[in-house]
Design a protein with these regions (language model features):
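Conserved N-terminal subdomain of the carbohydrate kinase-like
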Residues: 3-6, 26-102, 106-109
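Short pre-catalytic strand/loop immediately N-terminal to key active-site residues, enriched for Gly-Thr
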Residues: 7-13, 192-206
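Glycine-rich anion/phosphate-binding loops
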Residues: 12-16, 79-89, 114-117
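N-terminal basic/disordered segments at the start of proteins
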Residues: 14-30
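Short, small-residue alpha-helix embedded
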Residues: 19, 142-143, 202-226
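Phosphate-handling active-site elements
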Residues: 29-33, 191-193, 219-233
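Charged C-terminal helix
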Residues: 52, 227-266
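Conserved phosphate/ATP/ADP-binding segment of small-molecule kinases
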Residues: 117-192
Length: 266
């Protein structure tokens, strides 16, 4: 069986973080493993508290995984401290990790910074260059490319700049600022590929970024090329959103198990 590892925070509401990643990986038929970077107290209306793990404990989690069940793909999510980012980068290098998908969570779609400038610097210098592909939103791509993004032409220029600077492929998510469903994949030496999707009118979008990146990792784990993996991941997330799950008082989660019947008759 193919295997995938998520390195991310825990979401007590189950809609994002490692919970969303594990659900996504399982739905995409790969064996999911996790290394937790932080515990969060949160629900659909917001985050109440965050407790980070120590770099030593994160390293021990990664050692335990890589020395026993070597993952076919890895996805990393939000990691808020420079020390933890460096720990992840060191361990991925030590174990010659492959098929690394980095969701560079550092700037909210509102433009607010989610991690410190020091952590952003470590992310850019240590972790992102190890990635097979990174999945920034528009504000994150603006930070990485050091340019303003207002049009699809800007998206292409920014993605090319990031790719050339960091040496990894870039899946730049259009988001609501340009077009809800249009994402751009830029790979070095290849023509840019646009993924044009139909907008799904569902206000419950908690965990979409986590879900997309872990779905890409799942498909890479199964040996698919990057473009096909993105295509399959986009199809999966569209199905999860289209099921119109409605839970909680705020922006709720999507239905990760939309294709699971859940009946186990003899």
């Amino acid at each position: 069986m193919f295997t995938a590892l998520t390195i991310a925070g825990s979401d007590s509401s189950g809609g994002a973080g490692i919970q969303a990643d594990i659900k996504t990986m399982t739905a995409n038929r790969v064996y999911a493993m996790s290394a937790i970077t932080a515990l969060t107290a949160q629900n659909t209306t917001g985050v109440t508290d965050i407790v980070e793990v120590t770099p030593k404990f994160l390293a021990e989690q990664l050692d335990s995984i890589f020395t026993d069940i070597n993952p076919d793909a890895i996805k990393t999510g939000m990691v808020s401290s420079s020390e933890l980012i460096e720990t992840i980068a060191d361990k991925l290098t030590e174990y010659h990790a492959k098929n690394i998908v980095v969701d560079p969570v550092m700037v909210a779609t509102s433009g607010a910074r989610l991690i410190s400038e020091e952590a952003i610097g470590t992310l850019k210098s240590k972790l992102l260059p190890l990635a097979t592909v990174i999945t920034p939103n528009i504000p994150e791509a603006e930070v990485l490319s050091e340019m303003e993004i207002k049009t699809e032409a800007d998206m292409e220029k920014a993605a090319e700049t990031i790719c050339n600077t960091l040496g990894c492929a870039v899946l730049l998510k259009g988001g609501h600022q340009l077009n809800d469903a249009n994402d751009l994949l830029f790979q070095k030496g290849k023509e840019p590929v646009w993924f044009h999707g139909k907008r799904i009118d569902n206000p419950n979008t908690h965990g979409t970024g986590c879900t997309l990146s872990s779905a890409i990792a799942s498909n890479l784990a199964k040996g698919r090329d990057l473009e096909t993996s993105v295509k399959y991941a986009k199809n999966y997330i569209s199905g999860a959103l289209a099921d119109m799950l409605d839970l909680g008082k705020g922006s709720g989660p999507m239905k990760h198990a939309f294709a699971l019947e859940g009946e186990y008759e003899r």
